[in-house]
Amino acid sequence: MVGRRKALLFSLCFFFLSLPSFSSLPSFQTLFPNSHSLPCASPVSFQPDSDSESLLESEFESGSDSESSSSITLNLDHIDALSSNKTPDELFSSRLQRDSRRVKSIATLAAQIPGRNVTHAPRPGGFSSSVVSGLSQGSGEYFTRLGVGTPARYVYMVLDTGSDIVWLQCAPCRRCYSQSDPIFDPRKSKTYATIPCSSPHCRRLDSAGCNTRRKTCLYQVSYGDGSFTVGDFSTETLTFRRNRVKGVALGCGHDNEGLFVGAAGLLGLGKGKLSFPGQTGHRFNQKFSYCLVDRSASSKPSSVVFGNAAVSRIARFTPLLSNPKLDTFYYVGLLGISVGGTRVPGVTASLFKLDQIGNGGVIIDSGTSVTRLIRPAYIAMRDAFRVGAKTLKRAPDFSLFDTCFDLSNMNEVKVPTVVLHFRGADVSLPATNYLIPVDTNGKFCFAFAGTMGGLSIIGNIQQQGFRVVYDLASSRVGFAPGGCA
């Protein structure tokens, strides 16, 4: 009797183990097309408040200091908010054009021989040589408001995980583009200081630049779209609400030209030592995170957090990978992709491998909008999605998107799920992160694209709704769903 029971239990166990796993079954989720449309250029969430800013200035003049705070939270707005005169269709078209330029520049940089890219911009008079820093891929997509100097003068700054330097326009200007706030004048700040040519900060720049008369450090950042900024490399106090961060090395640009219209400059969040996280690791424990909202369906602002509060308890982490060839970017290991609950055949870790000389790989980027995958992986993923979405009415291609659907007058539709399998972290995307509106007539497109190069990029559309955690102390990146609440 006992033997029969054991045999029966063994048979049942074998039967259940032989069944396909639940994850291999087709899986769908619901998209509500009528609830998602092209976002308008909504007003920025942090309109200048002269009273509070004046209060901060008076506090600092009297010697008050609030530098002890361990975490800082700031609102973020999309760069489209600075183009209030454009229609939703025009804004989306401009976004895709910016995205194409950025991806092209990153791909060009990644394809070069090992070593930092150097692009020379016009050399202004009085400069013995130029310092080239940062990467030639243009600015990011999100900006915040912060104070510069003492007393604090408030300006808008673009945040970008693909840049390694902090810089802003400074008076006097030889050439300056239009910005929404008065240009920062370092002569009116009590805490501004130039950096000697012999200092460690100056030596960390990609090449040595020195004003031979004043013996002070110079910097230059050149971008792939032809824009550039040149000026003095200096230190200054930055103010985030009521928190001061002293001695931040930044570029004070007196000669600037480019596409950074509206924002005063850029707060680099890359992996390099001169980025804002790189310089302030002792203050914020080498941790920061951001959460980017779906602007077509949420009135909440996006946000960025520096410090221990940046780390979500529910985040799933994947290790950061090192690439000396492009040490600014955050590389991760992508092992595969599932569509409709099933791993896409042929999309394996080998397609996304970062080789020994720095080619290939996958980066997480806040400034790229649409995720680009190496072409064989994209084609396999796209074809799997088309099969899973075969009941939806197809629509003509749109811009870089080759898989589009006519969802006009539809309240809800079932779409295949999409999961990105990183090393140690499976990230299940909401439907709104991969099937997005591209016009005001109900056309939705699969928001991925292929790339002919070897580098894949996880863009900010796919990051929406997740708190993306950069824990540099532990060399890892995490994803926490629902992190914008």
Swiss-Prot record:
Its EC number is 3.4.23.-. Transmembrane segments: none annotated. The active site is at 160, 365. Residues 50-64 have a biased composition (Acidic residues). GO terms for biological process: proteolysis. The keyword Ribonucleoprotein does not apply. GO terms for molecular function: aspartic-type endopeptidase activity. Keywords: Hydrolase, Protease, Signal. Residues 142-480 form the Peptidase A1 domain. Pfam families: TAXi_C, TAXi_N. Residues 43-71 are annotated as: Disordered. InterPro entries: Aspartic_peptidase_A1, CND41-like, PEPTIDASE_A1, Peptidase_aspartic_dom_sf, Plant_Aspart_Prot_A1, TAXi_C, TAXi_N. Residues 1-23 form the signal peptide. GO terms for cellular component: plant-type cell wall. It comes from the Eukaryota. Belongs to the peptidase A1 family. Aspartyl protease. Not able to cleave BAG6. This is Aspartyl protease family protein 2. It comes from Arabidopsis thaliana.
